């Protein structure tokens, strides 16, 4: 009986561990370029910020860049979806936001697209952009 209780306790600890180790989500940003890794110079960050603001003014679509040091073992897909749900980039009701995520140490990138833009910026196109234009 004691052995069974120990096994159940161990199982519960192991099941709870992935959630406890999840990378934290920063609060929704007030900038378009968010460099949590310190990878961009102030001039690079500000220049990109101005480009994204200008693009948003003409397209009405909101693009946000988020640069992190590492995923800390979390999957890229899981973290990007959690971040997108927390930040809610884009206009309310249109869901026309895009988050470009970069994880410097992991050498991983992802483009997370709001539902309102999925017909224009498909997963295939986002993947092509990452392979041909960014990498």
Where in this protein do the model-derived segments appear?
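Bacterial N-terminal signal peptides
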Residues: 6-17
């Amino acid at each position: 009986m004691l052995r069974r209780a120990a096994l159940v306790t161990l199982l519960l600890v192991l099941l709870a561990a992935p959630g406890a180790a999840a990378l934290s989500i920063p609060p929704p940003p007030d900038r378009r370029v968010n460099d949590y890794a310190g990878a961009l110079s102030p001039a690079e960050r500000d220049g990109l910020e101005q480009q994204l603001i200008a693009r948003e003014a003409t397209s009405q679509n909101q693009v946000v860049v988020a640069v992190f040091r590492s995923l800390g073992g979390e999957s890229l897909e899981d973290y990007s979806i959690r971040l997108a749900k927390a930040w809610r980039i884009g206009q309310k009701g249109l869901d026309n936001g895009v988050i470009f995520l970069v994880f410097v140490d992991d050498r991983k990138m992802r483009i997370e697209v709001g539902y309102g833009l999925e017909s224009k910026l498909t997963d295939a196109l986002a993947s092509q952009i990452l392979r041909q234009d960014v990498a």
